[in-house]
């Protein structure tokens, strides 16, 4: 697997490769063995990278259409989140940093279909929080507003013009990123709050 930079940071990730034999699915046994022991027993909030970002950043092997696994990926994520819900988590944070980029029509279509299906499958009491970062969401506000979220998080560090997007996001709760994840140790609180 290829390793590349996570957006424009100095962090790296292994690029997922999607091929004809790729069949994403959720395994509660594997999850119970490898992830469950690491989870906080307080069950505050479960966080994960969203499927739109995952698929957008994935690489197609042998010119295979990576978007052909959308339905299987939707089911895998939905099964995982229903499992998390049954563990007692009332808050789910889905991170979609790709929303700060120019999305392809396929990404936009996948976003709409995934979040529509997710809201149909989760208990209405489960609060879904959408987190964006690494860019301006202006081109994707309508898309974001078309889905139902308890809160939407906007990045003010990479692009402070997101501030003007607050009133255009159709969500009752907005959170704002004011601390740079690139250098959290050099934060000057006074200057940050003045901004």
Positions of predicted regions on the chain:
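Domain-level signal for soluble alpha/beta catalytic cores
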Residues: 1-195
């Amino acid at each position: 697997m290829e390793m590349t930079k996570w957006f424009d940071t100095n962090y790296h990730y292994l690029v997922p490769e999607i091929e004809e034999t790729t069949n994403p699915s959720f395994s509660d046994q594997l999850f119970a063995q490898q992830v469950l022991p690491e989870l906080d027993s307080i069950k505050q909030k479960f966080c994960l990278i969203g499927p739109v970002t995952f698929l957008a950043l994935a690489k197609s092997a042998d010119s295979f259409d990576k978007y052909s696994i959308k339905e299987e990926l939707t089911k895998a994520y939905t099964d995982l989140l229903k499992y998390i819900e049954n563990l007692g988590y009332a808050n789910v944070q889905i991170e979609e940093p790709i929303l700060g980029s120019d999305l392809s029509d396929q990404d936009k279509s996948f976003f709409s279909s995934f979040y529509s299906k997710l809201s149909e499958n989760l208990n209405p009491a489960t609060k879904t929080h959408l987190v964006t970062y690494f860019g301006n969401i202006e081109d994707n506000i309508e898309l974001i507003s078309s889905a139902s979220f308890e809160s939407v998080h906007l990045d003010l560090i990479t692009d402070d013009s997101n501030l003007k997007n607050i009133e255009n996001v159709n969500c009752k709760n907005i959170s704002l990123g004011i601390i740079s994840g690139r250098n959290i140790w050099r934060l000057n609180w006074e200057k940050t709050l003045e901004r």
